[in-house]
Amino acid sequence: MDVFVLDTSVFTNPEIYRTFEEDQRGAMETFIHLALNSRAEFYMPTSVYTEMRKIMDVGELWAEFEMVVKIRSPRRFQLTVPADFLYEFIEELRYRINKGLRIAEEHTREASGCEDVGKLIARLREKYREALRQGILDSKEDVDVLLLAYELDGVLVSADEGLRTWADKIGIKLIDPKNFKNILESLVRHRF
């Protein structure tokens, strides 16, 4: 049986949810219908589900969503992750922190002759955020999705490039989230 671990991006990223329907509510309804008629299992970490409920308002659909998606946290205290994963993650963090410092230094030098400090700060924030957050695990929710997919040997469904990059490093199966609806439709057609 196929096991899919879902990230919020399936339902909040317009590029992804529009593969199901034009709006988030319709996308969730279509997902629920397909999920109910497939033989697959679907999981989402509790922290991710909580985050998604704050972002989306789909009313009574939450009950149906919980009927098809098992909401649970990874067993963090029982999981063993490869030491190389942690080593590489720390190395990546150090690289990004140093890159962020260089960006801050560059903008500090520019500030001496700058008339519009507000624009400079906005540019600094943008570049700093890009240097430190893009392409990396940057939240506990990301780590929960990664660990749950690892624990269940599930297929990760996410548009988050950082999450996908790190999942691939530890051997988690991935699908292109833009293909998720077609995969579900195929599972429904071939379920017997």
From Swiss-Prot:
GO terms for biological process: tRNA 5'-leader removal. It is an enzyme of class 3 (hydrolase). It comes from the Bacteria. It catalyses: Endonucleolytic cleavage of RNA, removing 5'-extranucleotides from tRNA precursor. GO terms for molecular function: ribonuclease P activity. The keyword Nuclease applies. Keywords: Endonuclease, Hydrolase, Nuclease, tRNA processing. HAMAP family: RNA_free_RNase_P. RNA-free RNase P that catalyzes the removal of the 5'-leader sequence from pre-tRNA to produce the mature 5'-terminus. This is RNA-free ribonuclease P.
